[in-house]
Amino acid sequence: MRKRKPWKFIFILLFAVAISLGVYVYQQQYEPDDLFVKVGEGILDNAPEIFSGEPKEVRELRKQEVADTDTQGLRQEYYFGQLNEEEQRGYREIIEGIRAKEKEFYLTIYEDDTVNRVYHAVLMDHPELFWVHNRKQVYKTTFSNANYCMFSPGYSYTDEEIQEIQAAADNACQEVSALVSEGADDYEKAKAVYTYLIDTAEYQESEDDQSMAGIFWRRQAVCAGYAGAAQYLLEYLGVPCIYVEGSTAGSTEGHAWNIITLNGNDYYFDATNGDQPEFLEGDAVQLAEHKTILYDYLCPFPEEYEMTYTPSAEFTVPACSATDMNFDVLNQGCFDSYDYQEILAYCQMRLNNGAAVVRFKFSSQEAFEQARADWINGDAIQEAARYYMTIYGMSQVEYHYGILENMKTIYYMF
């Protein structure tokens, strides 16, 4: 005969008591019809999440209208225009989350390529979001069978540092504005920004070199910092400008530059290379006192620039073809053919105007080679040097030369 286990009776007794209490509570709180309504309402309220699997935050995001332009009116958002409707919604969600400095937030996009493309568009359109990590340092959480994700951009600075950097950027806007005369056209504004960036910063790798923070705060940056700062200042002055990333011929390193719009035409703008006097071949590069601004990269000849730099295929960029706003063209220093007397007269005119640097450019390789044979390998410069001594009453003068081969330009520094 099997023994009965007393704990089974205890369990049954407790279960019966629990049922009784439950019925009692139910009877005390609700009538049967009321309870049915309460349960029904709960199911209806949560039906979208129950059946779609989406959190309430995601469903709210999908209901929001997508603004066609920057809600703060700060940027032209060139790359936003190249996104499809779904991507544009994700673009706005990313900007809202970053501006609020949220550590993580939902996106209604989720595929890796899509999130990466949209985030890249945000970064290139918005240099003012300097406190966010680049796209190699973000984290994304996806969910099984879900078409949304949790995005964690990561931030580079404390709130105090962000305030310091923004104050430095605001100060830069005021300083560059002071360089622009009232009624200045867009080319004059572009030249002022180009000159300001080169005079302000040094090309130098640092922890802050990938954004405008490096330029305005640390005064050191690489191409990404220069291009972001240029975009920030030019858009502040009302000059249409976009940020461009691409590759460098003969190098594994990428490069960043800008494209600006002047009088309806598009031009390259590369302040990084303008701040690279070591690009010059010749003894002038050894002169510490000569930090020569290379204006060759302010509206350069497109075919010359494109021999070295190619934009990424991820997005399309405007085609540049005009040469009329090139620095040398505007200053009558670009020549289609070589004539010694013509070049000498140009040098004398520049020296008469007080120039310490004389530069001249050629539109053809043949003319450039002829000039190099006379002015670099020959002694054509001697006549210009004698003219310089006559102007300043000197018995001797020291001069140095530089050549920018890819731009077919010759420099002399007195």
Stretch-by-stretch model annotation:
Residues 225-300:
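Hydrophobic/aromatic-rich core segments of domains that either
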Residues 158-215:
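Secondary-structure boundary elements
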